[in-house]
Amino acid sequence: MGRMHSSGKGISSSALPYSRNAPSWFKLSSDDVVEQIIKYARKGLTPSQIGVILRDAHGVSQAKVVTGNKILRILKSNGLAPEIPEDLYYLIKKAVSVRKHLEKNRKDKDSKFRLILIESRIHRLARYYRTVAVLPPNWKYESATASALVA
């Protein structure tokens, strides 16, 4: 799938392991991995950060292979899932930082244009999350209250 606001094709990607089973050298049980996920979520880490830590520190290539569930599903079942989806959260955070930059640098036309692109991405993603019922139907992005969402 190509990029939304540029001509890039986006063909670079990582290759998933062919085997859908845990490797033979992997010794942790699925309960241990779930406990680790819950522990890191309570520290305030996002699902992708938890996945990176599990991969680098504990040798878990994919949590779904070991536990049978994705990290976000495990967090939802334990009531630790973030209220705003992670990709939407980081887009809002980026828009807040660009808006803060524009307060100091009012003549920065390029940043003004990029802010419009970021906010259009936010609106499109929010519309998708409302249709799949991840966000409530009356949820709306407003630039005035956005800094409170990411703080």
From Swiss-Prot:
InterPro entries: Ribosomal_uS15, Ribosomal_uS15_arc_euk, Ribosomal_uS15_N, uS15_NS1_RNA-bd_sf. Pfam families: Ribosomal_S13_N, Ribosomal_S15. Its main location: cytoplasm. SMART domains: Ribosomal_S13_N, Ribosomal_S15. GO terms for molecular function: small ribosomal subunit rRNA binding; structural constituent of ribosome. One of its GO terms (biological process) is translation. Keywords: Cytoplasm, Ribonucleoprotein, Ribosomal protein. One of its GO terms (cellular component) is nucleolus. It is found in: Cytoplasm. Belongs to the universal ribosomal protein uS15 family. Component of the small ribosomal subunit. Mature ribosomes consist of a small (40S) and a large (60S) subunit. The 40S subunit contains about 32 different proteins and 1 molecule of RNA (18S). The 60S subunit contains 45 different proteins and 3 molecules of RNA (25S, 5.8S and 5S). Component of the ribosome, a large ribonucleoprotein complex responsible for the synthesis of proteins in the cell. The small ribosomal subunit (SSU) binds messenger RNAs (mRNAs) and translates the encoded message by selecting cognate aminoacyl-transfer RNA (tRNA) molecules. The large subunit (LSU) contains the ribosomal catalytic site termed the peptidyl transferase center (PTC), which catalyzes the formation of peptide bonds, thereby polymerizing the amino acids delivered by tRNAs into a polypeptide chain. PANTHER family: RIBOSOMAL PROTEIN S15P/S13E, SMALL RIBOSOMAL SUBUNIT PROTEIN US15. This is Small ribosomal subunit protein uS15. The lineage of its organism: Eukaryota, Fungi, Dikarya, Ascomycota, Saccharomycotina. The gene is RPS13.
